[in-house]
């Protein structure tokens, strides 16, 4: 093999490695669609030993009439809890209520799940993930027992397969190989034209 052929082969190898490394960095990310899984309720046995003392709710929590507005973060220094009892649901700053469920995040509110809408040119399937935040539910009976359930969040996956990038990579590699092949043939034909005297 001549010196020029070895140099050309070395350049082609380096170019191929560069293409593989740069293709690894050029990945596309698609929006994540999150669905919320229902959380089972926690109940405890009623204890009737101590009377329940309640404090009147401040005006900021008392004026809110929906679960989502109860957790509005625009009001400074306000911690409100959405309380769901058998007969009524309301917003309060007091989390110690007998025989009711107390929620402290908007995940406690019943929200319809979003359905992913694929675009016309997309070949990747949407990834459905659980919400990264956690939800806490507390069931308090009149007395001393508080049970809190906090589910753990699963790690977020961002890997998707993009068919357009895959096909583009194949076309790029085949194009580079064709250029190298024709350069090699061109150099070989020049070597054959020269004759020693």
UniProtKB/Swiss-Prot annotation:
Protein's organism: Homo sapiens
Clinical condition linked: Deafness, autosomal dominant, 66: A form of non-syndromic sensorineural hearing loss. Sensorineural deafness results from damage to the neural receptors of the inner ear, the nerve pathways to the brain, or the area of the brain that receives sound information.
Protein name: Sialomucin core protein 24
Record keyword Metal-binding present: no
Glycosylation sites: 26, 32, 41, 72, 77, 94, 104, 121, 142, 146
Organism placement in taxonomy: Eukaryota, Metazoa, Chordata, Craniata, Vertebrata
CC terms in the record's Gene Ontology section: endosome; endosome membrane; extracellular region; lysosomal membrane; lysosome; plasma membrane
Position of the signal peptide: 1-23
Family: Belongs to the CD164 family.
